[in-house]
Amino acid sequence: MKQVLLKAWRARGWLARLLWPVAQLHGLLVRLRRALYRRGMLSSERFKVPVIVVGNVVAGGAGKTPLVMALVKHFQAQGLRVGVVSRGYGRSGHESLEVRPGTPVDESGDEPALIQHATGAPVFVAQRRTQALRDLLAAYPATAVVVCDDGLQHYALQRDIEIAVFDDRGVGNGWLLPAGPLREPWPERLRQGVDLVLHTGQQPAFEGYTSRRQLADHAVAADGSSLALTALAHQPVVALAGIASPEAFFDMLRARGLTLQKTLALPDHHDFKTGDLNALAGRTVLCTEKDAVKLFALPDHSKIKLLAVPLEFSPEPAFFTALDGLLTPLLSQLPSSHGHQTT
C-alpha cells in the first residue's frame, strides 16, 4: 500500500483525486491547529537560547538528520556550545533521556544515537521536544544554540529559525496527505515562517539552497578501523539499508564502483534483532551509518563482515552564510555565560 501511495503522490491521477476530499479536510485541520497556536489558544514555549528547527513538509525522509549533523559540526567549528533535541522516532520509551555513547539504541532511537556518535554534542530525546529542551538546558546551562531534529510541525516549541528540507521529490503533486505527500500546504508554509530551504537531491524542483551528498571512499568496521571501498571493487558484496530511500544508498554504492550481489531494502528505522544476520553469515555486508548504530550492537554481528559507509553531506557555502546572518543577532543577545567553549 505504501508503494501505491508513493506512486500516486507523483501526479494527480485517479487515486490522488479520489483522496482529494480527505486532503481538503486535512488542510482545514492543519490551518486550524496552526491558527490556535498563533493566537495563543494552544500553549507553546519559548526558550532563552536560539532554537533552530530542521524538518520537512513532505512525508518521509529527505535528509534532515545529515543536515542536523552538518549544522552541529558547523557551530562546533565556530566554538559554539550546541545541543540537539529530538523525539527519537521508534524508541521504546517516552521519558526524557540524554543520549550517551552507551545508551541502548532502542531507548534513544537510531537517529539521535547517530547524531551523538557523529558529533559528540549533548543530545536529549523525549516525546515532547519541549521537555527534552528543558532537560538539555538544565544539564548544560551554557548551551548557546539548540538544533531540533524533525520539529517543523511541533508548534508547541517556539523557534527562531526554521529550515525546510526537500529531496528530488520536491512537493510531489502538490497536494496534502493523503492525496499527496504534503504534511502542510506549500508554498503557504514558506510564507508562514520557513527561513531557509535546502535541497538534498540532485534536481531541485524550486528555489532554495543546494547541497552535495555522496558516500565516503571508505567503510568503517565496528572497531573503528577503515577499509577503502576500492578494496571491495572486485568482489561481490551485500548492501542493506533501513532508511527512507534504500535505493539511493544502493545507487551511491554502485557509483563508487561496487558490485552489489544482493540488496536488502528494509523499512525506515528497521528494528534489527539477534538472528537477523544469520542468512548473511560469512558475507561482506555494507550498511548505512544509521543502520550501523543498531547492527554493531547485536551480539551476532561478528558472523558477517559488517561495514558502515559514511555519508558526506555538505550544504553549499551560501547556505551557511545565510544561516549565520540569521543567528548572529540572536547570539549577541545571550548572557556572557553562554556562547563559545573555552579551551
UniProtKB/Swiss-Prot annotation:
Superkingdom assignment: Bacteria
Family under the similarity heading: Belongs to the LpxK family.
Protein EC: 2.7.1.130
Function: Transfers the gamma-phosphate of ATP to the 4'-position of a tetraacyldisaccharide 1-phosphate intermediate (termed DS-1-P) to form tetraacyldisaccharide 1,4'-bis-phosphate (lipid IVA).
Keyword Transmembrane helix applies: no
Keywords annotated in UniProt: ATP-binding, Kinase, Lipid A biosynthesis, Lipid biosynthesis, Lipid metabolism, Nucleotide-binding, Transferase
Gene Ontology terms, MF aspect: ATP binding; tetraacyldisaccharide 4'-kinase activity
Pfam families: LpxK
Binding-site residues, ATP: V58, A59, G60, G61, A62, G63, K64, T65
UniProt name for this protein: Tetraacyldisaccharide 4'-kinase
Pathway: Glycolipid biosynthesis; lipid IV(A) biosynthesis; lipid IV(A) from (3R)-3-hydroxytetradecanoyl-[acyl-carrier-protein] and UDP-N-acetyl-alpha-D-glucosamine: step 6/6
Organism: Polaromonas naphthalenivorans (strain CJ2)
Any one biological process term the GO annotation gives: lipopolysaccharide core region biosynthetic process
